From Swiss-Prot:
Residues 1-226 are annotated as: Pyrophosphorylase. It catalyses: alpha-D-glucosamine 1-phosphate + acetyl-CoA = N-acetyl-alpha-D-glucosamine 1-phosphate + CoA + H(+); N-acetyl-alpha-D-glucosamine 1-phosphate + UTP + H(+) = UDP-N-acetyl-alpha-D-glucosamine + diphosphate. GO terms for biological process: cell morphogenesis; cell wall organization; lipid A biosynthetic process; peptidoglycan biosynthetic process; regulation of cell shape; UDP-N-acetylglucosamine biosynthetic process. Keywords: Acyltransferase, Cell shape, Cell wall biogenesis/degradation, Cytoplasm, Magnesium, Metal-binding, Multifunctional enzyme, Nucleotidyltransferase, Peptidoglycan synthesis, Repeat, Transferase. Its main location: cytoplasm. Catalyzes the last two sequential reactions in the de novo biosynthetic pathway for UDP-N-acetylglucosamine (UDP-GlcNAc). The C-terminal domain catalyzes the transfer of acetyl group from acetyl coenzyme A to glucosamine-1-phosphate (GlcN-1-P) to produce N-acetylglucosamine-1-phosphate (GlcNAc-1-P), which is converted into UDP-GlcNAc by the transfer of uridine 5-monophosphate (from uridine 5-triphosphate), a reaction catalyzed by the N-terminal domain. This is Bifunctional protein GlmU. It comes from Psychromonas ingrahamii (strain DSM 17664 / CCUG 51855 / 37). NCBIfam families: glmU, PRK09451.1. UDP-N-acetyl-alpha-D-glucosamine binds at residues 8-11, 22, 73, 78-79, 100-102, 137, 151, 166, 224, 330, 348, 363, 374. The gene is glmU. In the N-terminal section; belongs to the N-acetylglucosamine-1-phosphate uridyltransferase family. In the C-terminal section; belongs to the transferase hexapeptide repeat family. Mg(2+) binds at D102, N224. Pathway: Nucleotide-sugar biosynthesis; UDP-N-acetyl-alpha-D-glucosamine biosynthesis; N-acetyl-alpha-D-glucosamine 1-phosphate from alpha-D-glucosamine 6-phosphate (route II): step 2/2; Nucleotide-sugar biosynthesis; UDP-N-acetyl-alpha-D-glucosamine biosynthesis; UDP-N-acetyl-alpha-D-glucosamine from N-acetyl-alpha-D-glucosamine 1-phosphate: step 1/1; Bacterial outer membrane biogenesis; LPS lipid A biosynthesis. The lineage of its organism: Bacteria, Pseudomonadati, Pseudomonadota, Gammaproteobacteria, Alteromonadales.
Length: 452
């Protein structure tokens, strides 16, 4: 039997105090609803129906997924109403899984367990035990079997004491839903159509409702406020940090680590505090990442050391290289083995050959540097004329003196040296010394102006 998933994502999210639709607020730099979409895809959903309402245009612009079937809920009249408008899109011979776009941490395992637990002709229901169940629908049982769900607004004092609550996530057969959904009523305190009412309908028909619980209550927590969003962000990050620690990565403090993408690590990797990982990052064996670094879509080879407060984006760092502190490596840069880039150096769209050093206070952009090059402090590649970018080529074993300006396009050939303070505008031959600076002039008996 095929599986269709309905994601409820029509809520406005008033308590978020934001113009952004609630489900577009992010966990780990990814919209909550995208987390849900990715999870249901991972369990093999054959079709995904996304119920949208508030901010529908924004939602469709941000979630550009051609595999989704978008269904508009013009009026938000409850979860049952959302499923009623989705009903015409169901096939009779498929299972229907209903989830929420603002419950981002739901795991693949929990959903797989829920689907497997659904009895023939019955309902699989995800529930959770909470010490403080305020606000949730309570699970009513008869002789141990799930018999119904009563919402907080409609519950009696006795029912309010029940700790087992409904998460709102369930799976049922489409042919049964086609009978139950049209029979829903809005005669309740909220005047809404509750999907939970189908539980009682199924029970009255003698159908079995099988309840499954997640490994962690955090999985089924929804987001209505920014505080709840922040709490789930921390829960997500701590889970990822725990996975890394158990795999052998040394995190100095798992509470001060942010993974906002995918991280692959070799053995004996060390990561200090306040490191942020974005996109796809690969760290080789023995890599050390200092405090406060940001790594974005980069590859760092074995035994490289990235010192504190450095940013590396869209680049590759070779084995045994040392970067930072306070270095910035911008996209499309390739730093090969044993390269050293020191403090307050920016590298952009450049290649640095094996053993090349750029110690401090320099900008290298749109450049190719050979092996064993030394870049003196304060060196700038002047690559932009206000319209176009130009390339600088520096050969092997070149020594660039401090405070040089290299006016691109220019080539400095193997073994050449530039004198400190030079402005290099023409190509430099192999093994030549290039000096491009004004002759020093001394004015004797000079007196500085004095303040009056």
């Amino acid at each position: 039997m095929s599986l269709s998933v309905v994601i409820l994502a029509a809520g406005k999210g008033t308590r978020m105090c934001s113009e952004l639709p609630k489900v577009l607020h992010k966990i780990a730099d990814k919209p909550m609803v995208q987390h849900v979409i990715d999870t249901v895809k991972s369990i093999g959903a054959d079709s995904i129906h996304l119920i949208y309402g508030h901010g529908g245009q924004q939602l469709q612009e941000k979630i550009s997924d051609g595999s989704l079937n978008w269904i508009k809920q013009a009026e938000q009249l409850g979860t049952g109403h959302a499923m009623q408008i989705a009903l015409p899109h169901f096939k009779n011979d498929e299972k229907i899984l209903m989830v929420y776009g603002d419950v981002p941490l739901l795991s693949e395992k929990t959903l797989t367990d829920l689907i497997a637990a659904q009895p023939p002709g019955g309902i699989g229901l995800l529930t959770v035990e909470l010490d403080n169940p305020t606000g949730y629908g309570r699970i009513e049982r008869m002789n141990g079997e799930v018999a119904g769900i009563v919402e907080q607004k409609d519950a009696t004092v006795a029912q309010l004491s029940i700790k087992e609550v409904n998460t709102g996530i369930l799976v049922a057969d489409a042919n049964d839903l086609s009978r139950w959904l049209p029979a829903l009523s809005n005669e309740n305190a909220a005047g809404e159509y509750y999907i939970t009412d189908i539980i009682k309908m199924a029970h009255l028909e003698g159908r079995i409702i099988s309840a499954v619980q997640p490994e962690s209550a955090t999985e089924v927590e929804g987001v209505n406020t920014r505080l709840q969003l922040a709490n789930l962000e921390r829960a997500y990050q701590l889970k990822k940090a725990t996975e890394l620690l158990l795999s052998g990565v040394m995190l100095r403090d798992p509470n001060r680590f942010d993974l906002r993408g995918t991280l692959t690590c070799g053995v004996d990797v060390e990561i200090d505090i306040n490191v942020i990982i974005q996109g796809n990052v690969n760290l080789g064996n023995g890599v050390v990442i200092g405090a406060n670094c940001i790594l974005i879509d980069c590859d760092i080879a074995e035994n490289a050391v990235i010192q504190a407060n450095s940013i590396i984006e869209g680049s590759s760092i070779g084995a045994r290289a040392t970067i930072g502190p306070f270095a910035r490596i911008r996209p499309q840069s390739v730093l090969k083995e044993e390269v050293h880039v020191g403090n307050f150096v920016e590298i952009k769209k450049s290649t640095l050959g094996n053993g090349t050093k750029c110690g401090h206070l320099s900008y290298i952009g749109d450049s190719t540097l050979g092996q064993r090059v030394n870049i003196g402090a304060g060196t700038i590649t002047c690559n932009y004329d206000g319209v176009n970018k130009f390339h600088t080529h520096i050969g092997d074993d070149v020594f660039i003196g401090s405070d040089c300006q290299l006016i691109a396009p220019v080539t400095i050939n193997n073994g050449a040296t530039t004198g400190a303070g030079s402005t290099i505008m023409i190509d430099v031959p192999e093994n030549a010394l290039a000096i491009g600076r004004a002759k020093q002039r001394n004015i004797n008996n000079w007196k500085r102006p004095t303040k009056k």
